[in-house]
Amino acid sequence: MKSRIKDCFNASEEEFSDWKWQYRNRITTVEELEKLILLSDTEKRDIKKALEVFPMAISPYYASLIDPDDPECPVRLQAVPQSAELQKSSWELEDPLCEDQDSPSEESCITHRYPDRVLFLISNRCGMYCRHCTRKRRVGNREHDYSEKAIREGIEYIRMHHEVRDVLLSGGDALLVSDERLDWLLGELFSIPHVEIVRLGTRAPVTLPQRITPELCEILGKYPSVWLNTHFNHPKEITPEAKKAMNMLACAGIPLGNQSVLLRRVNDCPVIIKNLCHELLKIKTRPYYLYQCDLSFGLEHFRTSVARGIEIIEMLRGHTSGLAVPTFVVDAPGGGGKIPVGPNYLISSSDTGVTLRNYEGVICVYPEPAEYSSKCQQKCTICDKHPGLKSDTGLARLYDEENDVIALEPEGLERKQRF
């Protein structure tokens, strides 16, 4: 397939290995696509309709991974539009995670949801437009590119909010900016005393591994605490080119993680996920999250049940090393944030002990200590410096002996207003 694509583009090996050539020559039309993979007349018509809603862009490299004769190829399903994208369920939203709601302004690049960290969108460009993208409202849309002014305002927001210790650069793709711009941005962020780490969210190692160059690795490696999370969804994506890219990053001292999305017909299988996680560990990449597919517009055909995700984790836990088991999370709609869900191994608990089961179904009892109080026993004042850790809200409030609270009630309970 690679040779076929090179011939189609009349490209040399040097050109094919150049990330800028790859980006310039992304496949964006049905006419270009049908030269590479088998398309029926119905598929051509459906793709053209889907492109009216969300554009297509496939790097020649990623296209080379597609089985041209298999409509069910897991790479193809992630890259090629389908008519199902035009079907909107009642639950689907343009901004299902309410990121815009947690931004300082409509034009801002910043989403500040969690207390000590922010999402900083720096690009709306990608090596490929994933069909399961949760930011379809922004990605590939020139109207939502980020100006120099917006980027500088984002930096200033972080500088003024001393609680922010962790910055996640994303987009689009955080690596789809120039080396010079990324170097400048990292320099600005690490000049802020309270910024401890910067994370990069990128799918470049998967869809555009040529982007990982010695020059880029030198830039990333010179800063004290840059982390990188990428997005492999299927073992077929872990190619020699991808392995080389990840190894270059690892050799530059960059800690690597992977965030997969659970996708129907792509990877909703415990064997596929297990193989993927094993292959990731072999390239020094920790399987970090397995996401339930978001409720973005036109993604109903990709979504699995949450129960299927839990089932997959159940089939991993104990059957492979803990390093190979990602955390399954639902990024809750309405801005609820990431909620971890998984199998329940705690059967019951009491003052004397807990009853547990293991992955084999073995049931055992673990005794609790005879005398123990959940009230902190430390004779220090460290918690006074972190008021957010005190248990005056949420479920923790019920267990705090200093709070005279036995139940938490939502505001506006109907039965409380009857009399």
Curated annotation (Swiss-Prot):
**Cofactor(s) for this protein?**
[4Fe-4S] cluster; pyridoxal 5'-phosphate; Zn(2+)
Q: In what residue span(s) does the Radical SAM core domain sit?
A: 112-323
Name the enzyme's class. isomerase
- As recorded in UniProt, its EC number(s) are 5.4.3.2
- Where on the tree of life does the source sit, at the highest rank? Archaea
Gene Ontology MF: a single term: L-lysine 2,3-aminomutase activity
Q: Where along the chain is Zn(2+) bound?
A: C269, C376, C380, C383
For this UniProt record, give its keywords in alphabetical order, as a comma-separated list. Answer: 4Fe-4S, Iron, Iron-sulfur, Isomerase, Metal-binding, Pyridoxal phosphate, S-adenosyl-L-methionine, Zinc
Catalyses which reaction(s): L-lysine = (3S)-3,6-diaminohexanoate
Bound cofactor: record note? Binds 1 [4Fe-4S] cluster. The cluster is coordinated with 3 cysteines and an exchangeable S-adenosyl-L-methionine. Binds 1 zinc ion per subunit.
Which positions does UniProt annotate for [4Fe-4S] cluster binding?
C126, C130, C133
This entry's comment on induction and repression of expression is:
Transcription is induced at high salt concentrations. Forms part of an operon with ablB.
Question: Looking at the keywords, is Isomerase present?
Answer: yes
Enumerate the Pfam families for this protein: LAM_C, Radical_SAM
Keyword S-adenosyl-L-methionine on entry = yes
Q: Which residues form a coiled coil?
A: none
Q: Which residues carry this modification: N6-(pyridoxal phosphate)lysine?
A: K338
Q: Which family does it belong to?
A: Belongs to the radical SAM superfamily. KamA family.
What is the recorded function of this protein according to its Swiss-Prot or TrEMBL entry?
Answer: Catalyzes the interconversion of L-alpha-lysine and L-beta-lysine. Is involved in the biosynthesis pathway of N6-acetyl-beta-lysine, a compatible solute produced by methanogenic archaea that helps cells to cope with salt stress.
NCBIfam families, sorted: KamA family radical SAM protein, lys_2_3_AblA
Name listed for the protein in its UniProt record: L-lysine 2,3-aminomutase
What organism does the UniProt record list as the source? Methanosarcina mazei (strain ATCC BAA-159 / DSM 3647 / Goe1 / Go1 / JCM 11833 / OCM 88) (Methanosarcina frisia)
Organism lineage:
Archaea, Methanobacteriati, Methanobacteriota, Stenosarchaea group, Methanomicrobia
Q: Gene for this protein?
A: ablA
